[in-house]
């Protein structure tokens, strides 16, 4: 869990299951906490149960099995990375559904956003249930719990048919539960990106990946352990493994372990169009993964020529740096690209000196090199990418500080590479303001990702399109050029899409708002929107191209953030519906004012 801290600092939880507890004793344990120190807190709380026990007791396996809380055979841990900006312990995984029958207890956690919650809510209420909470996690828990109840009841009837009674029925149920039945009858109804893990009170454990492979999952198993994690290097470090030892869970596949410890891979849902998320590779995932490191490096290197154009090929007076730390590997790629270009120019200059160059001339040429500095520092550990909206701007103004005199004022260009630019909050409220204090000749902000034009409904829930600086800039261009009829046309087209019957192919009608404008036009408008008041330094934006994205990350084609090509019907429905909401509430309100 410590090695996956990059996947969430808002909370953490763990659960454990004992396989051989007697009635009257707890067999399913859970601990949760909020805050960036949550991992430390939950383990400290677990260890409190062991105070006062002798080393002999702690080393006694039989004593541990019968008497020690959290000493079990099944474990599950989760780090919270908000997908909605909501906070509170009730949102921290794992979630637990209790029952007096061991086999009906279900503990669940996961990385997911479901895009058809209305449909699921309707299915549950049609069954006669009355859900207390309207959220994808809670509804998934209840839906899966209902199917688990049905699987237990199926085995109960079978046991009675075999003439079994009382405890023999319970043993039969626990020995014959088919978690694959539960997963098949549950997950066929859900639309979205997910990796869901669960454990039952009777000792079954599972992990399932969505059929589009949107969210990542890796596993390792041998004769002693079965382990699943969101990232490969976490397993490598924790269990001292090579890349080749670890497998990736396939689309729609589940890794299931029964109470006897027998692990099997089962195809629960037929694979759909392969759409593994590219933004996982750019931002979310740990950069120490072998392949992710190479991909991020290439993303940066591919931007070399466009950055050189932005600084008029003046490498002598250009300083390279990066913000935030997740952009560091892309920064290395950019510096490698600069080095290759400078080295090539050195060769050309030396050849041009002729057959008898002077030592001084050669020395001057060889002095040319990359100028890279640590210009910005993250002053405190604050994340503004996903924060409750009313506090985001205030946080952003305090996130970064600068290294003073790291560039030559009014002479040096300053190039800052970021992994991606989403809202532009930190740029506007902090970064551009503090970089301007260095008085560079020009600031070039480089994004290793393409322009983010559409929300992600599969992992990071940013439901309002007006949150994106690219969208806001495009709307401003539309208004400036008196093209607001285009917005109305898109609005009407979106309404037609969401009115289509379920199962009919949907299109993303919102794409049309971007078509009249070039990337450069949108970039210039973004600069106008994000430029702090009083800033005088010229600013230019450079984004990765879609082609560059796929060239650097060829095995993860999911690019809906940038293209609007959502792989699931639920994603398509939401992008159209959210534009309808924007048009009816924000755009019309703007016109009235």
Cite the ranges covered by each PLM segment:
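Conserved short alpha-helical segments that host acidic/polar catalytic motifs at enzyme active sites
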Residues: 1-250, 256-319, 323-324
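A short acidic (Asp/Glu
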Residues: 24-29, 119, 207-210, 217-218, ...
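Amphipathic alpha-helical
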Residues: 157-177, 338-357, 361-375, 381-382
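PRPP-dependent phosphoribosyltransferase catalytic core
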Residues: 187, 202-204, 209, 221, ...
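Phosphate/ATP-binding catalytic cores across multiple sugar-kinase/actin-like superfamilies
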Residues: 189-192, 295-316, 329, 334-337, ...
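Conserved hydrophobic/aromatic pocket- or pore-lining residues that grip, position, or stack substrates
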Residues: 255, 303, 320, 334, ...
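Terminal amphipathic helices with adjacent charged low-complexity linkers/tails
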Residues: 261-277, 322-359
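Extended, hydrophobic alpha-helical segments in both membrane/secreted and soluble proteins
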Residues: 320, 327-334, 338, 372, ...
